């Protein structure tokens, strides 16, 4: 065997091994460095630390094993707060036949929003008073999703601009539809 034949056979061997090894190495690098987030379909942020409804001060006796959309009201409910409540309500109503499986919940800090609460009671909302413990855990102006087992699993920041409000409603509706579609509980 000549030198050129040996170098050709070695090159062929290296190429054959490379064809199988290089994609594995690239895939490992892509996963560890998070180059691709194409597999993520949720719009809200998943919570890193587990959070229980009792830690938020939610009275679970008033809610019968349903999915919850929880909104922590700020101290003063301005126009953005009203628009957030409207967006949550519209997303809730857009669920259609799935609405009996979902309950929107408002966490009211020390009962300060009576006029707002009387308006919401007509729309199938649960109003819960926030305790001091809940105030420490619930960020005001944040929207949470909780499963029927009482685990808070997803969080959304309150939108600030008109475009963000439109996107927020679509995102919340999309996530709720997926959760309800694949849920075997509640």
Show where each model-derived region lies:
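Short active-site neighborhood of thiol/selenol oxidoreductases, capturing the structured segment around
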Residues: 62-80, 88
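Short acidic, S/G/P-rich loop/turn micro-motifs used as interaction or catalytic elements
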Residues: 75-80, 111-113, 160
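Short extracytoplasmic/periplasmic juxtamembrane "stem" segments immediately C-terminal to an N-terminal membrane anchor
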Residues: 41-59
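Conserved helix-turn-beta segment immediately C-terminal to the redox Cys motif
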Residues: 85-105
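Short, internal strand/loop/helix patches
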Residues: 103-105, 115-149
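Thiol-/selenol-based redox modules, centered on thioredoxin-like
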Residues: 153, 157-186
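A short, hydrophobic beta-strand/beta-hairpin element that forms part of a small beta-sheet core
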Residues: 88, 141-159
């Amino acid at each position: 065997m000549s030198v050129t034949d040996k170098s050709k056979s070695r090159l062929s061997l290296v190429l054959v091994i490379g064809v199988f090894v290089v994609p594995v190495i690239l895939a490992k690098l892509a996963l560890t460095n998070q180059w691709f987030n194409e597999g993520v379909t949720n719009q809200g942020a998943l919570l890193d630390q587990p959070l229980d409804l009792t830690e938020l001060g939610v009275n679970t006796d008033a809610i019968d094993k349903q999915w919850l959309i929880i909104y922590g009201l700020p101290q003063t409910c301005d126009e953005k707060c009203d628009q957030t409540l409207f967006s949550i309500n519209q997303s809730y109503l857009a669920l259609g036949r799935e609405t009996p499986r979902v309950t929107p919940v408002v966490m009211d800090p020390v009962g300060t929003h009576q006029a707002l609460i009387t308006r919401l009671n007509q729309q199938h909302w649960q109003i819960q008073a926030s305790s001091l413990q809940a105030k420490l855990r619930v960020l005001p102006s944040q929207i949470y999703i909780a499963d029927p087992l009482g685990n808070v699993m997803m969080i959304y920041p309150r939108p600030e601009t008109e475009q963000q409000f439109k996107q927020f409603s679509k995102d919340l509706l999309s996530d709720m539809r997926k959760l309800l579609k694949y849920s075997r509980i509640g």
